[in-house]
Amino acid sequence: MLAVYQTRFLEAALAADALKFGEFTLKSGRHSPYFFNAAAFCNGKLLSVMTEAYAAVIAELHETCAIDVLFGPAYKGIPLVAGIAQALFHRYDINLAWAFNRKETKTHGEGGNIVGASVAGKKVLLVDDVLTAGTAVRQSLALLAQEQAMPVGLVIALDRQEKVGDSNLSALKQFSVENQLQTRAIITLDDLMTFVKESGKPAVLEKMQAYRKIYGISEAD
């Protein structure tokens, strides 16, 4: 059964065309029966729904994992961390700092690679929309190491739960294992399939089941 924030998130994603069902060719070359584009959450109402969903996940994680700063990789992570920080404070009375990186180092003014809160010596939670190759997130980890920060985890919007290479690990699980970090997602492929089933879309569900049989991890993590 989906949580209320998950249902609201998926309903908003459908309404915004952030979530589409059909035939899509991914960057990996795989032919997927669904497509997710977080950039379509591009107005105040949609951003609010998305950041409140992130906040729900992070508030639960915060109960067992100390977090000082939310970090959003530029550019997509910038509005996310700002909105999530607000949602955490208003909904859960959790007051976290937030920061993001510059794409290019600034040599004048305040300078540096980081904008926002200082991350030095802080427990930092990374936030991004999806994790595929993970290039931006890994670059962020390298930058945070230079800044003497202490990364504690990563939260994304969608975990596709697809195998990476010859392993039976998803991209998110592989990232967790490689970096010894906590990882969470608002929605997993399992959650999405539950939503599709409850929405009365048997044809779509059948295609998703077939897709997962080929590319999905054996068990949900």
UniProtKB/Swiss-Prot annotation:
Statement: the UniProt record of this protein carries the keyword Transport: no
Residues engaged in binding orotate: F35, F36, T132, R160
GO terms (BP aspect): 'de novo' pyrimidine nucleobase biosynthetic process; 'de novo' UMP biosynthetic process; pyrimidine ribonucleoside biosynthetic process
Name of this protein: Orotate phosphoribosyltransferase
Subunit structure: Homodimer.
Keyword Zinc: no
Family that this chain belongs to: Belongs to the purine/pyrimidine phosphoribosyltransferase family. PyrE subfamily.
Assigned keywords, A-Z: Glycosyltransferase, Magnesium, Pyrimidine biosynthesis, Transferase
Cofactor or coenzyme needed: Mg(2+)
